[in-house]
C-alpha cells in the first residue's frame, strides 16, 4: 500500500481527553512520486490503514512544472485550506513532516523558479503548513533552491550558481537553531548527491491556520539585525529560501585558518569540475579541469566574526 519516497510522522498525544491518550501516539504516513497520498497508520501493525480512517488520495496537488497541476482535471483537494490555489503547491516527491510550535510543516521536493524570476526546476524543497498532520494546508513557498540563487553581477536579476536536479530533505531544530537538510547534484548528475545543510529562521504565530495563522520560513543570517537573508534583484524578484553556502553547521563563518575540501565550493560557473569520490571514509571531493575564466567560490569565511559564534 505504501508507495514511493515514504515518511512517517509520530504525533505525541498528551491530552487526557484524547481517545489515543492511553497509547500515547498517533502515526501517519506520507508518500508519492508526482502524486501525493497520506493516511493514518494502524497502530497495531504500523503499515496498514487505521480502521475507521481513510486513505487521502491527491493529498497535495502535484505539478508537471511550476504552476501547472498534473492531477486529472477536476480533482478535488479536501486537504487544502478553503480558497487555496492548487497551483501554489507544485508537489513532486519526498514528503517529510515536522511539528513547529502548534502547527505542522510539510516539506517536499517541488517545482520552483518562476516565482523569483528563474526557470522551473524540481531542484527545490517547498513547504506547506497546517493545524494537523492531515491539514488542511496552505502553501508556504520555497524552502531552499539547491541551484544556489544569488543576484547576478550587476544586480539586475537573479541567477544560479549550481546545477539543477531534484532534491530531498527536511527540517530539524538543533540547539535552538532550525536547519534545512537537502542535497545538490554536482555536475547536474542526479545520481551524484552531495548532502547539504543551511540555517533557516522560522516564525510561527499561535492562531490556527483556519483563522489566518501562518508559518514563515526564510534564510537565516546571524549577522543581520533581523537575522534574515534574501536575494533581491532590481527587476523586483526576491528569493527568500535558504542560502546555499560552504559553511554547513559553521553558520558564523568557516575558520579561515583551516584546510577544507575543494568540494564544498558553493559557486561554480562550469560543469564537470566536481569529481566523484567512491570512498565512504574520505569526505573530500576534488575539482579538476579548471582553466582560464573558471570561477569557483567559497562562502563564507569568518574573518573577525567567529568570536560571536554561539551556535
Give the residues covered by each predicted segment.
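Carbohydrate-active catalytic/glycan-binding domains of CAZyme proteins
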Residues: 1-308
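Extracellular ligand-binding interfaces
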Residues: 311
Amino acid at each position: 500500500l505504501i508507495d514511493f519516497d515514504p515518511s512517517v510522522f509520530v504525533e505525541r498525544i498528551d491530552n487526557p481527553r484524547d481517545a489515543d491518550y492511553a497509547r500515547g501516539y498517533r502515526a501517519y504516513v506520507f508518500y508519492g512520486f508526482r502524486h501525493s497520498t497520506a493516511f493514518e497508520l494502524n497502530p497495531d501493525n504500523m503499515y496498514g490503514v487505521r480502521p475507521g480512517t481513510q486513505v487521502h488520495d491527491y493529498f497535495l496537488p502535484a505539478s508537471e512544472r511550476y504552476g501547472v497541476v498534473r492531477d486529472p482535471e477536476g480533482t478535488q483537494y479536501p486537504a487544502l485550506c478553503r480558497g487555496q490555489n492548487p497551483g501554489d503547491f507544485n508537489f513532486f516527491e519526498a514528503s517529510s513532516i515536522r511539528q513547529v510550535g502548534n502547527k505542522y510543516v510539510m516539506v517536499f521536493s517541488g517545482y520552483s523558479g518562476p516565482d523569483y524570476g528563474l526557470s522551473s526546476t524540481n531542484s527545490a524543497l517547498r513547504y506547506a503548513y497546517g493545524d494537523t498532520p492531515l491539514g488542511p494546508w496552505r502553501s508556504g513557498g520555497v524552502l531552499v533552491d539547491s541551484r544556489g540563487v544569488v543576484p547576478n553581477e550587476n544586480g539586475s536579476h537573479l541567477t544560479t550558481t549550481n546545477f539543477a536536479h531534484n532534491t530531498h530533505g527536511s527540517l530539524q531544530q538543533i540547539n535552538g537553531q532550525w536547519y534545512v537538510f537537502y542535497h545538490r547534484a554536482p555536475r547536474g548528475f542526479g545520481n551524484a548527491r552531495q548532502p547539504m545543510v543551511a540555517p533557516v529562521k522560522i516564525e510561527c504565530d499561535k492562531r490556527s491556520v483556519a483563522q489566518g495563522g501562518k508559518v514563515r520560513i526564510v534564510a537565516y543570517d546571524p549577522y543581520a539585525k533581523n537575522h534574515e537573508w534574501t536575494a533581491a534583484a532590481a527587476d523586483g524578484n526576491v528569493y527568500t529560501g535558504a542560502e546555499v553556502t560552504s559553511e554547513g553547521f559553521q553558520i558564523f563563518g568557516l575558520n579561515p585558518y583551516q584546510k577544507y575540501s575543494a568540494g564544498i565550493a558553493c559557486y561554480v560557473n562550469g560543469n564537470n569540475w566536481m569529481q566523484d569520490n567512491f570512498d565512504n571514509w574520505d569526505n573530500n571531493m576534488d575539482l579538476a579541469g579548471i582553466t582560464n575564466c573558471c570561477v569557483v567560490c567559497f562562502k563564507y569565511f569568518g574573518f573577525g566574526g567567529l568570536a560571536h559564534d554561539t551556535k
